[in-house]
Amino acid sequence: MTSTNPVVAEVIPAETSTDATETTIATTEAGEAPEKKVRKAYTITKSRESWTEGEHDKFLEALQLFDRDWKKIEDFVGSKTVIQIRSHAQKYFLKVQKNGTLAHVPPPRPKRKAAHPYPQKASKNAQMSLHVSMSFPTQINNLPGYTPWDDDTSALLNIAVSGVIPPEDELDTLCGAEVDVGSNDMISETSPSASGIGSSSRTLSDSKGLRLAKQAPSMHGLPDFAEVYNFIGSVFDPDSKGRMKKLKEMDPINFETVLLLMRNLTVNLSNPDFEPTSEYVDAAEEGHEHLSS
């Protein structure tokens, strides 16, 4: 019996072929795999907006200035939101990584409870490893053919290892005067240029010059490595004399370089990895004495 009521006819519309097809597919899938949940269709609520060349240039400039501070990048670009900027940045970083281009990619920001906060600082263990005990030279004294350092050289090595700067008068004695006092109570200071070649002279007032004379020598330019390594070689030469006099006559930068290398040498020689080399030296010395006899 067909209803003649027009309202009822509008409420029950005729089923289209598309709806019938979707219903059939859903019923078939449900019958084959009833335990599988049907995923909800993904709908794009907002269309993606393309980036203009000017906006992309602003984005690249903001990356150089603010790294991954998206809020500041948003304010700098002006026409994009943080969500759009982060999405654009993700695609840009993947493109750079894929193409291997030399572009600025800021490092990822640290997590709140990161084990190594960004930027990473030098660990305390690495700094503590430099402060080694002065008992190591006594172990080195047992090496064949080794001449013990005198008291002055041992004191300098103690300065290098401990990192403790001696009083001003002792430092002046070791490094020499850095400034010269003229006859008119004017002090002339000579310092190397930034490139390490040549020097520049200027005259200072009495009060300012005296303050500079009491300060520790500044490190400028490059050390004379020939002089530095010649001195370190003389430390192991039993016939070498006047080592302290050579140290006093050195430039401050050469003096500091000698202390640094002697400290590193002390640490390396005291390393357990050096023991096989020490045993080899002992065996070679015994073999040499046997052949000589």
Curated annotation (Swiss-Prot):
Coiled coil: none
Induction text: Circadian-regulation. Peak of expression in the afternoon, and lower levels in darkness.
Gene Ontology cellular component terms for the protein in this record: cytoplasm; nucleus
DNA-binding segment(s): 70-93
Deletion phenotype: Monochromatic blue and red lights have opposite effects on the period of triple mutants rve468 lacking RVE4, RVE6 and RVE8; lack of blue light-specific increase in expression of some circadian clock genes. In long day conditions, rve468 plants have a larger size and a delayed flowering. In short days, rve468 plants exhibit long petioles.
Keywords, comma-separated and alphabetical: Cytoplasm, DNA-binding, Nucleus, Transcription, Transcription regulation
Domain HTH myb-type, residue spans: 43-97
GO MF term list: DNA-binding transcription factor activity; transcription cis-regulatory region binding
Biological function: Probable transcription factor. RVE4, RVE6 and RVE8 are components of the circadian system acting synergistically to regulate flowering time, redundantly to regulate leaf growth, and antagonistically to regulate hypocotyl elongation; their action seems independent of ZTL and HY5.
NCBIfam families in the record: myb_SHAQKYF
Name of this chain's protein: Protein REVEILLE 4
Species in which this protein is naturally found: Arabidopsis thaliana (Mouse-ear cress)
